[in-house]
Swiss-Prot record:
PANTHER family named among the record's database cross-references: 60S RIBOSOMAL PROTEIN L35/50S RIBOSOMAL PROTEIN L29 (PTHR10916), LARGE RIBOSOMAL SUBUNIT PROTEIN UL29C (PTHR10916:SF0)
GO biological process, one term: translation
InterPro entries: Ribosomal_protein_uL29, Ribosomal_uL29, Ribosomal_uL29_sf
Keywords of this entry: Ribonucleoprotein, Ribosomal protein
A GO molecular-function descriptor: structural constituent of ribosome
One Pfam family named in its UniProt record: Ribosomal_L29
GO cellular component: cytosolic large ribosomal subunit
Keyword Ribosomal protein among UniProt keywords: yes
Keyword Ribosomal protein: yes
Family note: Belongs to the universal ribosomal protein uL29 family.
Record gene name: rpmC
Top-level taxon of origin: Bacteria
Gene3D superfamilies: 1.10.287.310
Organism of derivation: Synechococcus sp. (strain CC9605)
Phylogenetic placement of the source organism: Bacteria, Bacillati, Cyanobacteriota, Cyanophyceae, Synechococcales
UniProt protein name: Large ribosomal subunit protein uL29
Length: 69
């Protein structure tokens, strides 16, 4: 999973961002579950998912702040 740059994330619609955030949260839950049961082989997926989630949430909060002003 390649990390998107900021321009790619900002070009997404609000609904796409929300869908991706939900998907990444589910993925992180599954990764934690796999790690707890010792089934996880690729631990680097944690970092990738967290970084992508942070990027999406940052853009989402920027949009919320700009509409509130």
């Amino acid at each position: 999973m390649a990390r998107p740059n900021a321009a790619d994330v900002r070009s997404l619609s609000d609904s796409d961002i929300n869908e991706q955030i939900d998907g990444l949260r589910r993925e992180l839950f599954q990764l934690r579950f796999q790690q707890a049961t010792r089934q996880l082989a690729n631990t680097h997926r944690f970092k990738e998912a967290r970084i992508k989630l942070a990027q999406l949430m940052t853009v989402q909060s920027e949009r919320q702040r700009s509409t509130a002003s």
